[in-house]
Amino acid sequence: MAYKILDTCVSCGACAAECPVDAISQGDTQFVIDADTCIDCGNCANVCPVGAPVQE
C-alpha cells in the first residue's frame, strides 16, 4: 500500500526532499505521491509538519 497526501498539505516540500525514490511532486494545489513509485518507507510521514502523508 502506498502513501497519499491529504488536503491538509501546506506545500512546504519537506516530504519531497526526504523521498528516496522521488515519488513525490508538486501538484496543482499540493504535493502528490505517485503510488506506483512509492516504496512505503514512511519518510514523508515522519518529516511532515502537519501529518498530511498517510498510508492508503
Curated annotation (Swiss-Prot):
Q: Name the positions where [4Fe-4S] cluster 1 binds.
A: C9, C12, C15, C48
Annotated 4Fe-4S ferredoxin-type domain residues: 2-28, 29-56
Can you name one GO molecular function term for this protein? metal ion binding
Quick one: which residues bind [4Fe-4S] cluster 2?
Answer: C19, C38, C41, C44
The note on the cofactor says: Binds 2 [4Fe-4S] clusters.
> Does the keyword field hold Transport?
yes
Cofactor(s) this protein requires:
[4Fe-4S] cluster
Top-rank taxon of the source lineage equals: Bacteria
Q: Which UniProt keywords apply?
A: 4Fe-4S, Electron transport, Iron, Iron-sulfur, Metal-binding, Repeat, Transport
Question: Which InterPro entries did the record assign?
Answer: 4Fe4S_Fe-S-bd (IPR017896), 4Fe4S_Fe_S_CS (IPR017900), 7Fe_ferredoxin (IPR000813), PSI_iron-sulfur_center (IPR050157)
Cellular component, GO annotation = cytoplasm
The family database entries (PROSITE patterns) matched by this protein are listed as: 4FE4S_FER_1 (PS00198), 4FE4S_FER_2 (PS51379)
Q: Give the protein's function.
A: Ferredoxins are iron-sulfur proteins that transfer electrons in a wide variety of metabolic reactions.
Q: Which PANTHER family match?
A: PHOTOSYSTEM I IRON-SULFUR CENTER, PHOTOSYSTEM I IRON-SULFUR CENTER-RELATED
What name does UniProt use for this protein? Answer: Ferredoxin
- Give the encoding gene's name: fer
